Amino acid sequence: MTLQCTKSAGPWKMVVWDEDGFQGRRHEFTAECPSVLELGFETVRSLKVLSGAWVGFEHAGFQGQQYILERGEYPSWDAWGGNTAYPAERLTSFRPAACANHRDSRLTIFEQENFLGKKGELSDDYPSLQAMGWEGNEVGSFHVHSGAWVCSQFPGYRGFQYVLECDHHSGDYKHFREWGSHAPTFQVQSIRRIQQ
């Protein structure tokens, strides 16, 4: 049985600054922003998420490294990217994370691309897929039945982050390029539900 995604009603709200420590120019968002450059910002260096979950991107047009931004304060780039192997010191586009419903999240992971090979059903957070019995350090494809998830390259939610949502690609991520991997790898070793 496939659960249908119900978009979060929002409202989403985030305040950003162009300098560290909540200093400099400020702007409030309640909807996606494909480029802060259009607002006269060169970059975003600090932010506060007041409601909803957001996805921040290194480059304009929702490109580059992805960072999940949940409710809280991010006084500098290391607060959102300090746990990654190759942190981006700036964010230039944002969008709300749709379908983030922590209680009802469900995801199927597949060993190979195009939903082939061994599979596993997830409905909880896994700081280490290997500890739950997943062989190897790669996932070939995903089907998001419900909710929104963030996958990380390494155990303990470290390394590159990839956001998976049930309303993007119809919840189907057949290949690493569809979930925004920056390296030609299927390496995913930890997965968690996105907090709303």
Swiss-Prot record:
GO terms for biological process?
Answer: camera-type eye development; lens development in camera-type eye; visual perception
Q: Which Gene3D superfamilies match?
A: Crystallins
Impact of changing F94S on the protein? In CTRCT23; modeling suggests that this substitution would significantly reduce the intrinsic stability of the crystalline monomer
Connecting peptide: region residues: 99-104
Keyword Repeat attached: yes
Superkingdom of origin organism: Eukaryota
Q: Which SMART domains match?
A: XTALbg (SM00247)
**Segments for region (N-terminal arm):** 2-11
GO MF annotations for this entry?
identical protein binding; structural constituent of eye lens
Q: Where is the Beta/gamma crystallin 'Greek key' domain?
A: 12-51, 52-98, 105-146, 147-195
Give the protein's function.
Crystallins are the dominant structural components of the vertebrate eye lens.
Q: How does it assemble?
A: Homo/heterodimer, or complexes of higher-order. The structure of beta-crystallin oligomers seems to be stabilized through interactions between the N-terminal arms.
In the record, the note on similarity to other proteins reads: Belongs to the beta/gamma-crystallin family.
State what protein this is by name.
Answer: Beta-crystallin A4
UniProt source species: Homo sapiens (Human)
Higher taxonomy: Eukaryota, Metazoa, Chordata, Craniata, Vertebrata
